[in-house]
Amino acid sequence: MITKLLTKVIGSRNDRTLRRLRKIVKEINNFEPTFEALSDDELKAKTVEFRERLDKGESLDQLLPEAFATVREASKRVYGMRHFDVQMIGGMVLNAGQIAEMRTGEGKTLTATLPAYLNALPSKGVHVITVNDYLAKRDAETNRPLFEFLGMTVGVNVANMAPPEKKEAYQADILYGTNNEFGFDYLRDNMAFRAEDRVQRERFFAVVDEVDSILIDEARTPLIISGPAEDSSDLYTRINTLIPSLERQDKEDSEEYRGEGHYTMDEKSKQVHLTENGQEFVEELMVKNGLMEEGDTLYSPTNISLLHHVNAALRAHVLFEKNVDYIVTEEGEVVIVDEHTGRTMPGRRWSEGLHQAVEAKEGVKIQNENQTLASITFQNFFRLYEKLSGMTGTADTEAFEFQSIYGLETVVIPTNKPMVRNDMPDVVYRTEEDKFNAIIEDIKDRVAAGQPSLVGTVSIEKSELLSNALKKSKIKHNVLNAKFHEMEAEIVAQAGMPGAVTIATNMAGRGTDIVLGGSWQAQLEKLDNPTKEQIEKIKADWRIIHDKVLESGGLHIIGTERHESRRIDNQLRGRSGRQGDAGSSRFYLSMEDSLLRIFTSDRMAGLIQSGMDEGEAIESKMLSRSIEKAQRKVEGRNFDIRKQLLEYDDVANDQRKVVYELRDELMSSDDISEMIEHNREDVLASVIDEYIAPQSLEDMWDIAGLQDRLKNDFDLDFDIQGWLDEDDKLYEEALRERILGMAVDSYKQKEEVVGAQVLRNFEKSVMLQTLDGLWKEHLAAMDHLRQGIHLRGYAQKNPKQEYKRESFELFEGLLDVLKTDVVTILSKVRVQQQEEVEKMEAQRQAQAEQAARRAQAQHATAENQLADDEAEAASPQTVVRDERKVGRNEPCPCGSGKKYKQCHGKID
């Protein structure tokens, strides 16, 4: 109550921000008469002037009013379009590194030109990031004339560009591209072997379009560059044949019959688990099919791989549905469908063998599993930018997440014209059939009135179901879903025509406005070199149709189901009522809808259904509140998953930074001999400690063992026993110094033979190759650790703390092994000539390019990995060993008596 009273008196935080920004808008507007009087050349010269003023010490904020006024004036001259005051406010919010919530049709693309121009002045590069290649190319081409008029260069960063093209694109002042490409380029750059092969420069300022889609919906999707692991396609096929025999154990089963089911499924958390009875049944089937020995168990260490395949196959059959979660193309390829946008995502694959299991289920060719070579989440990638901002039509519901994870404040920008859309209350039916009948009747009424309708569905399956119902009713319509998005632009262009009916699978993220009366630009594009008269006629005809649609009530939105997220529902509604146009919206629900079925209590469902007749609808405030409560619950759960995923990935991210910084240092240095020398001292000192314990008596020294170790591992043939026999005053410290000194002399002799420059190049190559190999193994080890870490909770330990502790130990081990391996290789390998180094370099370069070509974003499916409230990250196929893993501090199995990490130990 007090908070509401205070807000009334002093305004909300958003109101206060807008008041402050409106004062700056007045400053910008004051420049308008002066700038209108400038010639084109004088206006263009402003860019050079601003850059000179920056060099003299002025800040971007000081330049902002003039810079924004310059862009507005240039836009008037190039496009005949003047930025509204609210767009100026949006531009300032973006420049401040915040999120601007701007309604659909308010001109986000034009708004982004303001901060993009201002932040391009320091010549550090501005990245405008969007969700797909089409939008990146479209926005770049749309805004290119404006930026080039002002003397700025524009680039595009999309998939399948050659490295030289990418490198050139990154030199542009303003670069448009997709989130995937920017992330992959970062990973590829950190797999390069030469500094000149890297394409990116510093990450200075980014404007993320559809920021909620990229920073929230995609936050659980790590970007992974992977290489193929061993082929196990036959195993997937054989195990796939066993799964249909399994039966689900219903939660309603009585205790007496509960043991009869083979697996349990939780629809809320999207998890599936074998029961004890199911485990025994699967083991019997495995034995019959020759996959396991009699008396063996799925959970023995040697069968972990089989268990992995069984779990993947079970999830593929039970949790993932064709035409909802994925489609199968005519070429026999399983393609993921994005649950948020309804788009297909070619090239993306689920990890953990799930994609292969789905391929086996559908009877198509099984692709090889993958091993992670490099990985980063979008959350951690975008936090690398010095300044990050974003735009979307729906951000306010996720404002807390933007603030807590990215430190981004959300500012709701007012519309240029008041919103007049009529949002009608939800209507709820008992069955899905009743609901669809009501939707058909509503559509018929709208078509008769000449009002266009946009019908939003949650899956391809539902869109096709509705399409068939409309065909039976002989209602002409278009379907816009993942299967037909090639025709998307044409369908969207005509979706605002009188009486048009468009079915769309999750319109979120489409990036194209539905214009009432259709798109006159689309008609214009069909003409070759249209005359001025033709253009005027098309515009005049369009105005008549536009006014007719407005009179009919504008675009009518029909929601066929509530989404888990209120934001997606708001995005669907937001397609109507753009720029003050008339419009309406209504959601039709049934008690059979997923959200209501899973999250509405049995008592509530019973109360509603008991009083409903067939075909009867209810509008209930209590039910609406219950639905919103369910949505909030799901949103909160998804936020917790993303937050936990980030907490886990932060551990890997800290290690990633160390490794990538080391790579940068190696690649930018021509001479790393000092680093090698320090490593040699550390490694040899550690080896000597094993055989001559510090401050120990001479009787306790193992001189013979030390001599053998130095000879075998470092090619150092020293007669240490002879030194001691000759000099009885050769004490421990002096002996250490002599060994280290002789090792340095031996290496210098090698340098004299092959030449200093050849050896410097070889040192760099060995260090990079060894680091990359160990980092790849380390990523696999981290994945394995992550998969089982939630089990620590049963031992009364905090899984997150255990993960941090053990991953730190793994990383320390990586650094130790890196030093040892590099020193060992450099000591033992005999380089004859520069050609050998170049050959090694070329081989590694080819491997890196091959790996980069395989780059793919793998879905983390984090909601399926939440075990004991601990979200687990996406991981590639687990590499399983036949024997028990040897601890790094345990005795080495080779029988040397040394610790494993000091003998044959490497990061597993």
From Swiss-Prot:
Give GO MF terms, alphabetically: ATP binding; metal ion binding; protein-exporting ATPase activity
**May I have one GO cellular component term?**
cell envelope Sec protein transport complex
**Is Cell inner membrane given among the entry's keywords?**
yes
- For this UniProt entry, what is the primary localization, expressed as one broad class? membrane
Residue stretches of biased makeup (Basic residues): 898-908
Q: Which SUPFAM superfamilies match?
A: Helical scaffold and wing domains of SecA, P-loop containing nucleoside triphosphate hydrolases, Pre-protein crosslinking domain of SecA
Under which main EC class is this enzyme filed?
Answer: translocase
Entry's EC annotation = 7.4.2.8
The record's section on Gene3D superfamilies has: Helical scaffold and wing domains of SecA, P-loop containing nucleotide triphosphate hydrolases, SecA, preprotein cross-linking domain
GO biological process, any:
intracellular protein transmembrane transport
Residues annotated to bind ATP: Q87, G105, E106, G107, K108, T109, D513
Similarity comment: family membership: Belongs to the SecA family.
Do you know which HAMAP family this protein is assigned to? Answer: SecA
- Record PANTHER family: CHLOROPLAST PROTEIN-TRANSPORTING ATPASE, SECA INNER MEMBRANE COMPONENT OF SEC PROTEIN SECRETION SYSTEM
Outline what the protein does.
Answer: Part of the Sec protein translocase complex. Interacts with the SecYEG preprotein conducting channel. Has a central role in coupling the hydrolysis of ATP to the transfer of proteins into and across the cell membrane, serving both as a receptor for the preprotein-SecB complex and as an ATP-driven molecular motor driving the stepwise translocation of polypeptide chains across the membrane.
Entry protein name = Protein translocase subunit SecA
Q: Which species is this UniProt entry from?
A: Vibrio atlanticus (strain LGP32)
Q: Which gene encodes it?
A: secA
